[in-house]
Amino acid sequence: MSTPISDLIAFLTADTSDFNALGLWKYLILLLFYGLMAGSLWFAVANWREDPSQRTGANLWLWATRVAIGCMWFQGTLWKLPFGHENGLYYWTQQMAGRAAFAVHRDFVANVILPNFDLVNPFVYLAELGFATALVLGLLVRLAGTAAALFTLNLWLGIYDKRPGDPDEWPWSYVFLIFLCGTYAVLATGRALGADAWLRRNVAAVRDGRGPGALVRFVS
């Protein structure tokens, strides 16, 4: 019987079915996860030490929830691997071709996405890995949160309908994630013990909004 504790241990030791499907590559993916977590902790500690305004319970809460949702996105990347027609992404893309709320969406998936799935798969993986990285580190969160909300909107609409025999999905779970990621963007939660706060304080071009730093400041 699985429990939250046993499932957490299995994930942290790369001993889940999704991890094991990757063979020895799973250890590289696990190392990446630990690297992101170490980076998140480094930015949190640095911000806490350097900026008294960061030392609030609200910032701790925003940091913890942002990192948790980033971990969710990271875990979700695993079933996009290995690339090919045997992974979970291909199955759910097929589902979208028959379950999307609107005909134009169904037709686009059936006639464009599925025939070019081998090209689409890496882009979807990198997009979700980007969301995970941004949220765990608190990096460019206004941009990443907006993109993640729109990405999830596509998922919500894509499997909105349910045909006989289709697996059940709870649509509200996607709605909650849309609003949560959108909230991270609106509140710019990368400024709560994240890389965005560190960049806006320590990188002159970002702090002063000069040159390319102005764009970084806008999306952070």
Q: Predicted segments — roles?
A:
Residues M1-A100, D107-L126, L137-S220:
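Extended, low-polarity transmembrane helix blocks
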Residues A127-A132:
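Core segments of transmembrane alpha-helices
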